[in-house]
């Protein structure tokens, strides 16, 4: 119903379901499936179901979101002591880190930045802890043939890209995406390989800021054929300093640039000294 009302009002914003009631846990799978993203609202949820149950339910919500390829945000009192203190407690550090290790896409501050004494330090501390936790990366799930139901071409391409990234040693995955859908699929399969999502759509780039491991980059491929668009994209990342000569990268793209939902191609590239892609070959 919320999505219908949004569309009738002419809106295209993503729907984030805030999980904060016991009734939501009883219908968790249905809520996650109907949403674009979910938020683990630990304050109100803890009051509803009790402190002892909260850690396990946080992990359950994150797992359910990952299983259904939805974005998940973990929030509430993550660095509460920094409302007053310039440094977080060790317990808060572990709390944030464990949420990242469990697979959350984003962590959220509230009072720490809304009315706290050290808002910038709180953001810096959370960023530092998140980056440290990502270095302790362990895959949430193994990419094995037959373990994923693939309903769309972009989903299949994303799974193939993440599987290959773990097998052939690439520097990055580059997704030319109009809507950001391919980047979302890529972010569902955990990897240590950075993902650069190139899109001309400001709305898509803002949405992709929430996707784990995804770095949105402004890029307009309209007017270029598929092969030239790929070469231009790689050159663009080279100029920005994200890629270097000799890097091997995987690229996902479609036959028609500028159209959403058309990702159907996976390519392996090697960068030359000037950032021009060489050895282009379809996989």
Model features per residue range: what roles?
Residues 1-283:
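Non-catalytic helical/linker scaffolds that mediate oligomerization, partner binding
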């Amino acid at each position: 119903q919320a999505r219908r009302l949004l569309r009738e009002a002419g809106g295209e914003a993503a729907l984030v379901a805030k999980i904060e009631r016991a009734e939501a846990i009883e219908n968790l799978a249905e809520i996650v499936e109907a949403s674009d993203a979910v938020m683990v609202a630990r304050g109100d949820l803890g009051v509803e179901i009790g402190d002892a149950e909260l850690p396990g339910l946080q992990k359950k919500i994150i797992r359910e979101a990952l299983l259904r390829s939805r974005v998940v945000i973990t929030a509430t009192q993550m660095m509460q002591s920094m409302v007053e203190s310039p440094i977080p407690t060790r317990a808060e550090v572990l709390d944030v880190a464990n949420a990242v290790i469990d697979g959350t896409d984003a962590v959220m501050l509230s009072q720490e930045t809304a009315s706290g004494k050290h808002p910038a330090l709180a953001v810096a501390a959370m960023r530092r802890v998140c980056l440290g936790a990502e270095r302790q990366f362990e895959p949430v799930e193994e990419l094995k043939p037959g373990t994923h139901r693939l309903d769309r071409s972009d989903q299949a391409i994303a799974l193939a890209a993440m599987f290959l990234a773990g097998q052939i040693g690439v520097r990055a995955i580059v997704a030319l995406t109009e809507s950001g859908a391919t980047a979302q699929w890529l972010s569902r399969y955990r990897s240590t390989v950075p993902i650069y999502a190139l899109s001309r759509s400001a709305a898509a780039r803002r949405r992709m800021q929430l996707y784990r491991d995804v770095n949105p980059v402004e890029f307009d491929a309209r007017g270029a054929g598929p092969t030239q668009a790929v070469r231009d994209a790689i050159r663009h990342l080279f100029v920005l300093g994200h890629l270097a000569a000799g890097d091997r990268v995987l690229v996902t793209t479609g036959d028609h640039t500028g159209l959403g939902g058309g990702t159907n191609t996976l390519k392996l590239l090697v960068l030359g000294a000037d950032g021009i892609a060489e050895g282009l070959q379809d996989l």
